[in-house]
Swiss-Prot record:
It comes from Schizosaccharomyces pombe (strain 972 / ATCC 24843) (Fission yeast). GO terms for cellular component: mitochondrial small ribosomal subunit; mitochondrion. Gene3D superfamilies: 3.30.160.20, 3.30.230.10. Residues 48-60 have a biased composition (Basic and acidic residues). This is Small ribosomal subunit protein uS5m. Component of the mitochondrial ribosome (mitoribosome), a dedicated translation machinery responsible for the synthesis of mitochondrial genome-encoded proteins, including at least some of the essential transmembrane subunits of the mitochondrial respiratory chain. The mitoribosomes are attached to the mitochondrial inner membrane and translation products are cotranslationally integrated into the membrane. One of its GO terms (biological process) is translation. The keyword Secreted does not apply. Keywords: Mitochondrion, Phosphoprotein, Ribonucleoprotein, Ribosomal protein, Transit peptide. The modification Phosphoserine is found at residue 85. One of its GO terms (molecular function) is structural constituent of ribosome. Residues 225-288 form the S5 DRBM domain. Belongs to the universal ribosomal protein uS5 family. Residues 1-22 form a transit peptide.
């Protein structure tokens, strides 16, 4: 035991032994309590009070040494305004009076070398400095006309400056787009699936007005539309701040008479995502050709990503015998007789997109006749016309 302790207390060792370092710390800690703690606290408080009083005196001297401006009366004596000698005050007042507005900053520094606080006071009250401050606080004026996105946009009609969209003048400017839908939209039906409030006209803003402003379709024709949300799911985006959750909705819109469209929406809540998808679906409505206004033309094969879709025309009274998602799209588009099947993936989002691409890629008899260079005649219709 003695050997080990003497080994740790070797004088020639490079590193202090652990026992010795611990003992040294305890001795320093005990020595700090030799004096009375009450006396030390009182002395520290006295020193702080002296320092604060000296700082206050210097501040009072600086405030009292301010030089009178041109607007102040010249009859005031230097002894009343500042503790400086009267000669220094006279020299400084002459410097202030001799300075013009066009004097550079370097000249001011050379004149006020010995009195920097007076130089700072003059710079603050200089007219050029005041103009610079006013320009910095004023809004920046640029030639760019940018519309910045704000969270308040969802509470305001987004097209306030385009009130002419729903008028007859705007419809006349785009006749090709409007004439395709004009005859089909006359079919009115009270839809139970409409999420919008078509209330009294006395209301300030409504979702129906929002849709009419976006699409250019009158509010009366929006009553014939049918809104069906087909895909609803919760989406999570992983960021460095954490997981940010949002709702995704895919909605199909149609008037049950040859016009349909789909739209996607993503927002924090389900209601906002649903309204967003409905607005985009109304904007994306397209005309869908139908044979005899009830079925498709022939057999359609479509592949969209991993979805392999097949649609077949069927006779009258056959009904809709297909996937539930295809069933709702056919109802919105006004297709009454069809059979279809889906092979491969049955993802709802890709199924809707594959269905709309298939309906728009139909080969019409008129197109086939033009390709072959032959006359096209529907024998069945011509036969029943004669009888």
């Amino acid at each position: 035991m003695l050997r080990s302790f003497s080994h740790f207390l070797q004088i020639g060792s490079r590193r202090q032994p652990t026992y010795f370092r611990c003992f040294h710390k305890t001795t320093v800690h005990l020595n700090s309590f030799k004096n009375d703690p009450k006396k030390e606290l009182n002395s520290n408080l006295n020193e702080k009070s002296v320092e604060e009083s000296s700082k206050n005196e210097t501040k009072e001297q600086f405030n009292s040494s301010s030089i009178p401006r041109e607007s102040e009366s010249e009859g005031k004596t230097a002894s009343n305004t500042s503790p400086l000698s009267p000669k220094k005050v006279e020299n400084l007042s002459k410097l202030f009076n001799d300075i013009n507005e066009d004097v550079s900053i370097e000249e001011l520094k050379s004149r006020f070398k010995d009195h920097l606080p007076f130089y700072e006071n003059y710079i603050r009250n200089h007219p050029l400095a005041i103009e610079a401050l006013q320009k910095s606080t004023a809004p920046r004026q640029t030639g760019l006309k940018l519309n910045y996105v704000s969270k308040l946009d969802k509470y305001v009609t987004p097209l306030d400056g385009y009130s002419h969209l729903g008028s007859e003048e705007s419809n006349g400017e785009i006749p090709d787009k409007w004439e395709d839908f004009k005859d089909d939209l006359t079919f009115e039906i009270s839809s139970k699936f409409s999420p919008f409030d078509f209330g009294d006209a006395g209301k300030s803003t409504s979702d129906a007005e929002f849709l009419s402003d976006i699409s250019g379709i009158p509010k009366s024709d929006l009553r014939a539309l049918m809104f069906v949300p087909l895909v609803r799911r919760r989406v999570v985006n992983q960021t460095r701040k954490g997981k940010i959750a949002s709702m995704y909705v895919l909605t199909v819109v149609g008037n049950r008479n040859g016009v349909a469209g789909f739209g996607e929406g993503k927002a924090e809540s389900y209601s906002l995502a649903y309204k967003q998808s409905c607005g985009r679906a109304v904007k994306n409505m397209v005309y869908i050709p139908r044979y005899d206004k009830r079925t498709v033309y022939g057999v359609i094969h479509k592949k969209f990503h991993a979805v392999r879709l097949t649609l077949r025309s069927r006779p009258a009274g056959f009904g809709l015998r297909c996937n539930p998602i295809l069933h709702e799209i056919c109802r919105c588009a006004g297709i009454k007789d069809i059979s279809g099947e889906i092979l491969g993936s049955k993802n709802g989002m890709n199924t809707v997109k594959a269905m709309f691409e298939a309906l728009q890629s139909q080969r019409l008899p008129e197109d086939i006749a033009m390709e072959r260079g032959q006359k096209f005649v529907d024998v069945q219709r011509e036969y029943y016309k004669q009888t």
